[in-house]
């Protein structure tokens, strides 16, 4: 019983600290249906909700087709079949997103890389995005790599 009281007190204190920190977060949950394109649907949702600084909190679901790009490769790799979404992580913004996906096949073989257009939902994709009203995520070249990298700015 003491453990539960201690845990409840900790949760209340943490909630109060977050509330007083000036950081406001929102949680957005949505479901994709069979045949929808995972990346296009996420990009569309981010645009519709005008999310300027967000991240994927969780995603579970499955795909029939996938299109991913492995590290340091110019072209994507694709395949058809039935695949579980093991993980989907990354940052999202109306200014550009950066998402990585891991999928597994029917034997449990798992692979992952940059999420590209062409990942079609098999049964479902249940997605939660958390966003911050405090920051804005931008993408720009910074000289350290040839790619547009994340720039975190205070929200105006």
List each model region and its residues.
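N-terminal intrinsically disordered, cationic/polar leader segments
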Residues: 19-53, 57-98, 105-156
